[in-house]
A protein has these predicted regions:
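Soluble non-cytosolic domains of exported or imported proteins
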Residues: 25, 103-111, 152-156, 160, ...
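Flexible, glycine/proline-enriched loop segments at strand-loop-helix junctions
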Residues: 99-107, 146-156, 194-201
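Catalytic domains of carbohydrate-active enzymes, especially glycoside hydrolases
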Residues: 29-42, 115, 122-127
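Preference for extracellular/luminal or secreted protein segments
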Residues: 1-34, 243, 252-253, 271-384
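Second-shell residues forming the walls of enzyme active-site clefts
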Residues: 6, 16-17, 22-23, 45-65, ...
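Active-site-proximal loop/short-helix segments
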Residues: 80, 85-89, 126-148, 175-195, ...
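A generic, well-ordered mixed alpha/beta core segment in the N-terminal half of proteins
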Residues: 89-124
Length: 384
């Protein structure tokens, strides 16, 4: 257990407020005291292309110096309305998933994703929390369909466009995340604001189809959970906190052994009902590997990341979390990080599934994700 405690920060993906690394006490604490394994950029961190590249270069260097490993820098860059590196900061406009789906042009989807990926790579960003593979079958859905974040209302089209989008991002050297598992397309409300019950609207066959198809093709880097409640899957907890949904359905039935990242634990659907402490422990216990905390500043001035780490530490010490489960989560995060560093073994980019399947602490695990590396070594961010 003791070797795990200093590495608990590796299970965090945290948002911060600064725009420059030097002399930023919050960012220094996050990278060097909490040792967060991943950092998340928002519009509040983005002023101009050169500024972002300078910020991420400092973050990569500082994390390497403090923690002795690569920092994963992530962003929501779906295109359209959800694009943190947007026109207000001097970047060109981008197409939404809805725009691309309506065009029916898969080549255009791949090219747009490649363009977005190139923008991220130049900015020093490693991980795009995209594409959205929610099937937009509910026209009244406010957060996915209303914001044009779905490729379409039919699973076949979602799979085809997501496949093209993944190919474009991977060609640019950027990691990806399918979201929001097990599906947010049927909801009538927004989990950013409060509790979302999809028991009567979820369509499992439809909503799981993109995950089944893309996982089978070996092109998935990570999967993000949704904060939706479906009593047919779990009568007590929403998906992010549900062992039945993450451990049972996603990892068990669907056979996913790669990284699972939560949606923001500070969203109303989670924070208002469970609190950050309990949510962090429940999520990791359910099978989530990376806890997304969009804002490190709690209303009382404390660091949300530190609260989460301390909650995980206490849960390890009192037996609520098994050391093997935490160790396996750390292994999967290490394997995801390694996907950026592994060169291609052939012109197709297909590699064996060996990397990350053996624990750095000597335990043996099944394949931790897809059987392809994300990125061409030549496409890695220069800051790395």
């Amino acid at each position: 257990m003791a070797p795990l405690i200093p590495r608990l920060g590796d299970l965090l993906l945290v948002g911060f407020h600064g725009t420059a690394g030097e002399d930023d006490a919050e960012l220094e604490r996050l990278l060097c005291e909490t040792r967060a394994g991943s950092a998340l950029l928002f519009g509040r961190n983005v002023r101009a292309p050169a500024q972002v590249a300078t910020l991420t270069a400092w973050m990569h260097a500082r994390a390497q110096a403090c923690a002795g490993r690569r920092l994963l820098i992530a962003v929501d860059a779906e295109g359209g309305r959800v694009m943190r590196l947007g026109t207000g900061a001097g970047y060109t406009d981008t197409l939404s998933h809805g725009d691309l789906g309506e065009s029916g042009d898969l080549t255009a989807t791949e090219l747009e994703a490649r363009r977005i990926g190139g923008r991220l790579r130049e900015a020093g960003i490693d991980w795009n929390l995209a594409p959205v593979v929610d099937v937009g079958y509910n026209a009244a859905n406010p957060v996915i369909v209303g914001n044009r974040r779905a490729f379409g209302p039919e699973p076949a089209a979602v799979v085809a466009h997501a496949r093209a989008y993944l190919a474009g991002l991977h060609a640019a050297g950027v990691l990806t995340a399918l979201k929001h598992f097990p599906g947010h397309g049927g909801s009538f409300t927004d989990s950013h604001l409060g509790f979302v019950d999809v028991t009567d609207t979820a369509k499992a066959t439809v909503e799981l189809a993109p995950y089944r198809a893309l996982m089978a093709e070996g092109v998935v880097d990570s999967i993000m959970t949704a904060h939706v409640f479906n009593r047919r899957l779990d009568r007590r907890y929403p998906a992010t906190l549900s062992r039945a949904t993450v451990g049972g359905l996603l990892r068990g039935e669907l056979g996913w052994h790669g990284v699972v990242v939560s949606d923001d634990l500070r969203m109303g659907a989670i924070e208002q009902h469970y609190g950050l402490d309990d949510a962090a422990v429940l999520a990791v216990g359910a099978g989530v590997d990376v806890l997304l905390i969009a804002d490190d500043r709690l209303p009382d001035g404390r660091s949300a990341a530190r609260v989460a780490v301390e909650a995980l530490r206490r849960a390890l010490e009192d037996g609520r979390l098994a050391p093997d489960a935490v160790g396996a989560a750390l292994d999967r995060v290490d394997a995801l990080r390694g996907r950026l560093d592994a060169p291609r073994a052939s012109k197709t980019g297909r590699l064996s599934s060996g990397a990350g399947s053996a624990s750095t602490r000597g335990r043996s695990h099944r394949t931790t994700g897809s059987d392809r590396r994300c990125c061409d070594a030549a496409a890695r961010p220069a800051q790395s």
